[in-house]
Amino acid sequence: MAIKAYRPITPAQRKKTTEDYDQITTNKPMKSLLKAKKQQAGKNNQGRITVRHRGGGVKRHYRIMTYNLPKDLTLTVEEIEYDPNRSARIARVQDQNGTYYYVLADTKMTKGTTFKTGSDIEVEDSSRMPLSNIPVGTFVYAIELTPGRGAQMVRAAGASAQLMAKEDGYATLKMPSGEVRKVLAGCEASIGTVSNLQHQNVKKGSAGRVRRKGIRPTVRGVVMNATDHPHGGGDGGRHGSGKAPRTPWGQLTLGYRTRHNKKTNKMIVRSRHEGKRK
């Protein structure tokens, strides 16, 4: 996969880059696996903004993804498709019974390739099996946190985790963030790397392209009024209050740790922040 650049016929095209879409084989999704997606604009059921900077953008249909494939299936890749709801490509696959699924596509998937799910299968690209059956050193994606719950980790474009060790019923994984953590060896994962490797190198190039993705502008707190942000106010403006930076709700930010889930600390062997400490 490559990145496509443009001749600067317009100012917006000067720094704009796009993906080349070479892996995609069709532009027509399967209607039975589509669902209407109502835009929430970052608001909850009470109409209050819970996620800022959301709203507008083009209309989309949601593709019904299957993150928990049944066991003992032989699946054939029918098409590789674009999905506007995620950074990775998706694969339309069919099992031996004629049932269709949408799954995350990896870098090795092409139209016509086959892969299997289950415990007693060969270790091949795209195969899905428990971590206990995967050799140490293998790169995996779409990893479960709880057996049978479906993939929750390593689903973004170009992502993969490496299986580092297996002992005492746990598998040790090195995550894309650099974190090393344990998960139950019975959790399933797919072998390979998520598709669309160059996604992180795409430059949007213009404000309009960002708005079409449903992202609204972000305003700095220092240019707001004092009632709207802890950094706001001041005659003529201030460029720093002399205090620690805070969020609009008064929480310390820019490096301040806000993680409270202490129950899973025992599963984290090495924090993703470890390499940043001096």
PLM features per residue range, with description:
Residues M1-N85, K111-K278:
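Basic, glycine/proline-rich low-complexity segments that contact nucleic acids
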Residues N85, V93-D95:
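Structural recognition of beta-strand segments within beta-rich domains
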Residues D95, A105, A165:
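Conserved strand-loop elements at the edges of beta-sheets that form or border functional pockets
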Residues D95-G98, P176-S177:
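Short acidic-glycine loop/turn motifs at beta-strand connectors
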Residues G98-T110:
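Beta-strand/loop nucleic-acid-binding surfaces
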